[in-house]
């Protein structure tokens, strides 16, 4: 075994790429490390494509092993199970920039598996996973237009920071990941604290500039360790068939794409395609219909793009910077804590907000450590939203990714736990879809949060931008339709407030997207965002003054931290009795903060009263109503507060001489007692006769 190793400095860390020792039966295997965070990336591709396949079957599997962090998995089986949300998101992060770098017409199955085998808790494994994937594909021999670079960019104290540590990210106003080739940005994923457009654009340019060192190093690594490139050539098109299809279908497709209603348009496109196939089959019964479908798809793309470049109206008749008609409704569901229905053209989201206590927060235990999410956002895309049938069940990768993008868009305006001590779950049900459903979810979430009384800092809106570029000519499109997303060159989603951007996601399919084009897209998106915010604010301009009557109300009180154990009780008996008997939820924190949650105000008051009783100090000279709990020869023990007992000596029972305690007191008898003394050991001395004397004097 002769390892080939390439090391280089990248930001604050040393990156090492190694091949030739591990997983040698794969087409390529790279052990990539950044500091102590190490991933094993393997690539395997089939030498032949399966017959009849009309798509590129690329699979990216990202898996985090708990041994990488020196942990043993929880659960009964004590081994890793289905991918977590974080693993799914990182798999998508790797997939998105590499997919457009495979050549058109390449249909061979390719599988990339990234395994995290060692992790430094200060170095996220996503960037080194992207770098390792780029290196493995570069040396595999599989047709791939790499290398690809990747960088994380932070923004701290007005300065960009390359690949910030986890600790630095905690103070950063920006968490942006950018990936690209030597000449082009291909993918951006980010979360920001309402930063200006120029700062966001600058971070993309900065990250792309910095990752050139990665691209150069991988090119050198490939020169030393790369396998011969596969002998693969793209399938050639039948020029005569292309001409026939153009003659038969171009005019019909052009007319079909003037129909503004999506379902009607699709129906007419199907009619045109069916007529074209029928005509071709009549002249050549053995024609390959799969090839015809592919060529019709290419013609369809050319027709739509040509209209846009020529300055003609878009598919639905709009100008490039126009937003579809908006409908905004808040408070549409009677029993939810907050709700909204946001409609933009043929895209619609029904969004609900549910408030809960801290114990409802999501607890996440990953290889990067434990964390708690008080704000959750779940996105559902049922098949009926696009007029189709399909499976309904656990969320797919796309749904998880779209939900996280919407979460990033909103998270910057969420209140702190001190400002709003609730856990918040938002669910976005996409009820109609024709482009930009994730950004509709951002708008709907902002509205539903306000309807629920969540004190978010300001409204947030999202917009999806598109691009059509032919040579030096280009058109930036606002509020793209699903067809424009599919047929265009860029999907550019921006969420933010009036003051700045909170989330930016870009997926670019071509090279040649300049800084100028991205700047135009950002400025056009700003205008669209403000327009949407104006409409949203007419429906609900600020959060409700109070939360829903159906939501649990959390009351916060403070107790002496030393009294926490008294509230909990032995084996949790006291707090269990409190919650069961009052019907409330009670949470205790180490600093003495007590949170009582209930939708019943009287139950909350009763819980507070009982907690105050338990935690109150015995006051010397005060009269308490107590209960006799034990009788002894020399007196009786009386409970005056939960967990607080005192002794009434036989001489303090009555002014008269008492020979037998049982003649004057009995178990469970309620008596008034006065606290005479609390000694150094906390023992309480009580008196019944002094209490009676004080009560008699007060009556007189």
From Swiss-Prot:
GO terms for biological process: mRNA catabolic process; RNA processing. One of its GO terms (molecular function) is polyribonucleotide nucleotidyltransferase activity. It catalyses: RNA(n+1) + phosphate = RNA(n) + a ribonucleoside 5'-diphosphate. One of its GO terms (cellular component) is cytosol. Mg(2+) binds at residues 485, 491. Its cofactor is Mg(2+). InterPro entries: ExoRNase_PH_dom1 (IPR001247), ExoRNase_PH_dom2 (IPR015847), ExoRNase_PH_dom2_sf (IPR036345), KH_dom (IPR004087), KH_dom_type_1 (IPR004088), KH_dom_type_1_sf (IPR036612), NA-bd_OB-fold (IPR012340), PNPase (IPR012162). Its EC number is 2.7.7.8. PROSITE patterns: KH_TYPE_1, S1. It is an enzyme of class 2 (transferase). Residues 552-611 form the KH domain. The keyword Nucleotidyltransferase applies. Residues 621-689 form the S1 motif domain. Coiled coil: none annotated. It holds the Pfam family RNase_PH_C. Keywords: Cytoplasm, Magnesium, Metal-binding, Nucleotidyltransferase, RNA-binding, Transferase. Component of the RNA degradosome, which is a multiprotein complex involved in RNA processing and mRNA degradation. Involved in mRNA degradation. Catalyzes the phosphorolysis of single-stranded polyribonucleotides processively in the 3'- to 5'-direction. PANTHER family: POLYRIBONUCLEOTIDE NUCLEOTIDYLTRANSFERASE, POLYRIBONUCLEOTIDE NUCLEOTIDYLTRANSFERASE 1, MITOCHONDRIAL. This is Polyribonucleotide nucleotidyltransferase. It comes from Shewanella baltica (strain OS155 / ATCC BAA-1091).
């Amino acid at each position: 075994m002769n390892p080939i190793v390439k090391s280089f400095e990248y930001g604050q860390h040393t990156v090492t790429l190694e091949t030739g020792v591990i997983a040698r039966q794969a087409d390529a295997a790279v052990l990539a490390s950044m500091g102590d965070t190490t991933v094993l990336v393997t690539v395997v591709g089939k030498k032949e494509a399966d017959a009849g396949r009309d798509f590129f079957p690329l699979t990216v599997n990202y898996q985090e092993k708990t041994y990488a962090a020196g942990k043993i998995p929880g659960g009964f089986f004590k081994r890793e199970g289905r991918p977590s949300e974080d693993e799914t998101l990182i798999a998508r992060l790797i997939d998105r920039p590499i997919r457009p770098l495979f050549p058109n017409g390449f249909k061979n199955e390719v599988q990339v598996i990234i395994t995290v085998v060692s992790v430094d808790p200060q170095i996220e494994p996503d960037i080194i996973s992207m770098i390792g994937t780029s290196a493995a594909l570069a040396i595999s021999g599989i047709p791939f237009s790499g290398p690809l670079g990747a960088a994380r960019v932070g923004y701290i104290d007005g300065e960009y920071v390359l690949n910030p540590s986890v600790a630095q990210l905690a103070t950063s106003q920006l968490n942006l990941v950018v990936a690209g080739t030597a000449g082009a940005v291909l993918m951006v994923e980010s979360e920001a604290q309402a930063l200006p457009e120029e700062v966001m654009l600058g971070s993309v340019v900065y990250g792309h500039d910095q990752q050139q060192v990665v691209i150069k190093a991988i090119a050198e690594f490939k020169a030393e360790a790369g396998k011969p490139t596969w002998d693969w050539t793209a399938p050639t098109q039948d020029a005569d068939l292309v001409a026939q299809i153009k003659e038969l279908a171009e005019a019909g497709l052009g007319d079909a794409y003037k129909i503004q209603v999506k379902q009607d348009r699709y129906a007419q496109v199907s009619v045109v395609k069916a007529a074209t196939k029928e005509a071709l089959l009549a002249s050549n019964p053995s024609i390959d219909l799969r090839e015809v479908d592919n060529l019709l798809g290419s013609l369809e793309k050319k027709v739509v793009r040509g209209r846009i470049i020529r300055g003609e109206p878009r598919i639905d008749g709009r100008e490039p910077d126009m937003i579809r008609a908006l409908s905004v409704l808040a408070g549409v569901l009677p029993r939810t804590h907050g709700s909204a229905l946001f409609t933009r053209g043929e895209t619609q989201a029904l969004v609900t907000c549910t408030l809960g206590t801290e114990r409802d927060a999501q607890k996440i235990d990953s290889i990067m450590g434990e964390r708690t999410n008080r704000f959750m956002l779940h996105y559902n895309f049922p098949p009926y939203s696009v007029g189709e049938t399909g499976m309904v069940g656990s969320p797919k990768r796309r749904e998880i990714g779209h939900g996280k993008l919407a979460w990033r868009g909103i998270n910057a305006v969420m209140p702190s736990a001190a400002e709003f001590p609730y856990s918040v779950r938002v669910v976005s049900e996409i009820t109609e879809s024709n482009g930009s459903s994730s950004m509709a979810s951002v708008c709907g979430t902002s509205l539903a949060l306000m309807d629920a009384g969540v004190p978010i800092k300001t409204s947030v809106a999202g917009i999806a931008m598109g691009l059509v570029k032919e040579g030096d000519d280009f058109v930036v499109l606002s509020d793209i339709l699903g067809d424009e997303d599919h047929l265009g060159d860029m999907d550019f989603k921006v969420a933010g407030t009036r003051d700045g951007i909170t989330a930016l996601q870009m997926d670019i399919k071509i090279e040649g997207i300049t800084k100028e084009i991205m700047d135009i897209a950002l400025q056009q998106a700003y205008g669209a965002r403000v327009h949407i915010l104006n409409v949203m604010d007419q429906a609900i301009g600020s959060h409700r003054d109070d939360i829903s009557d159906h939501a649990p109300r959390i009351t916060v009180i403070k107790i002496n931290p030393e009294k926490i154990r008294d509230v909990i009780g032995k084996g949790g008996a006291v707090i269990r009795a409190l919650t069961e008997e009052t019907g409330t939820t009670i949470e205790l924190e180490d600093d003495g903060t007590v949170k009582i949650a209930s939708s019943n105000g009287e139950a909350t008051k009763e819980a507070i009263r009982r907690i105050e009783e338990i935690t109150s100090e015995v006051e010397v000279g005060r009269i308490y109503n107590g209960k006799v709990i034990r009788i002894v020869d020399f007196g009786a023990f009386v409970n005056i507060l939960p967990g607080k007992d005192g002794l009434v000596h036989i001489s303090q029972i009555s002014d008269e001489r008492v020979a037998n305690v049982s003649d004057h007191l009995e178990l469970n008898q309620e008596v008034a007692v006065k606290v005479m003394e609390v000694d150094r050991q906390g023992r309480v001395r009580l008196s019944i006769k002094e209490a009676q004397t004080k009560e008699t004097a007060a009556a007189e």
